[in-house]
């Protein structure tokens, strides 16, 4: 009798232990009523400046960032249907690194919708590298207008996260 009870308890524990392994998130499928309002497939030979702005500066952006964001095609360019953003170790305007910071602010904004992007980041141990895909509020100034971090890949530590700042 004791063996039977112990067997039932162990079996139940094992089954309950497997529950977290069952996927609980279903991929959102587009409703037939949804319509595409904007996309950029980067299929030209340059960045579409009617939609994108290369933000420039080396002020740290409130995050103590060490790079200078340039508008140079060395740091951001379109090739083979993809947008490439390249960080470089180089002295530039009192900074030791350069990169690109691109935004659609003032050119594209959305109140509701599904946002989607294909993003590939380089591998390796790269301290300080922080690729991200964000959405910022249209009205007011940050941080009062909110921020939706769809993807942040901090320091390439096998971590991809998202966050809502409100």
Stretch-by-stretch model annotation:
Residues 5, 23, 66-69:
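Generic alpha-helix initiation/capping and coil-helix boundary signal
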